[in-house]
Amino acid sequence: ERTKTGLSELDRVLGGGFVQGSLTLVGGDPGIGKSTLLLQICQKLGEQDKNILYVSGEESVQQIKIRADRLEITTEKLKLLSETNLNIIESVIAKENPDYVIIDSIQTMFIDEVSSAPGSVSQVREATSRLMHLGKGKNISLIIVGHVTKDGAIAGPKILEHMVDTVLYFEGDKQASYRILRAVKNRFGGTNEIGVFEMVHSGLREILNPSEFMLSGRPENVSGSVVTCSLEGTRPMLLEVQALVSYTTFNIPRRTATGMDFNRVVLLIAVLEKRANLQLAAYDSYVNLTGGIKIAEPSLDAAVAVAIASSYKNVAVSADTVVFGEIGLTGEIRAVSMAERRVAEAAKLGFKCCIV
């Protein structure tokens, strides 16, 4: 049985809501908004008369209460516990019998019977295993927060991601206001679905039309700017690709790529030199996917190539044009999946021409 959270962007990522007895792992950089998201989930579930136990190993009950007041969390179905000893947490769960338990975070939990320090591989593995069996046995949905390493992977043993039912990554540029929730594993739904949120003073606000949000403030009639359409899961999203091609006096030109695969950009520059006869060897090339979002889809190829050519020729691309398609080594543009859905998304926002 599924329970919709009431947050449509989160339900989209989960595949329709939380499954009873499931174990969900949420990872993300410090300060990205994981705890804020979880408290807002508590409010929505509380409105559906669900009992929630929020266990924090990093903050006191008073500190959680301060944040909950700021986020206007008013549900009386939420109970707070500041504890790191899993044996005590299990006894509280047995006494309260909640529908949902949130553990923030799994790296702070410890078990008396395991001799190593909290956060160690054995402690994290054993704590997750105990919680998994507890949730399945009592049909309690568990949500655990996991710290991430400096390269973005969830800290702890890789088996942690194998043990849980769903792995969600909460990501985004801290300098930007938006956040992206991405499912990288989901036993009860599709993967690579994304939900888009905006961080405001009162918490996270859902972005129901991310294309319009991502293109806000886009300059028109400027060379090097091209709109493309990427597909994240089943959701088409319009994004702006910017390129700057600048003459250099150095022997080796600079190449940079932000938000996309650097090697792919270098390959496209080589294709433009060989097939389109653009003399880019004496020019620095800087390519950026605006908004700080990261996309690994090959459908960006055509937009990147057009943006580079536009900047090199100093000719602006028409503001009502969308470009997407994969480029091969011989210079051909290959078809990409769900082209009709991408075109429909572009038409919805008033674009009149698609180059595919």
Describe the residue ranges of each PLM region.
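P-loop (Walker A) phosphate-binding loop of NTP-binding proteins
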Residues: 29, 57
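Conserved Rossmann-like nucleotide-cofactor binding loop
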Residues: 60
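Peripheral, non-AAA+ core regions of ATP-driven protein-machinery
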Residues: 1-15, 19-25, 32-39, 43, ...
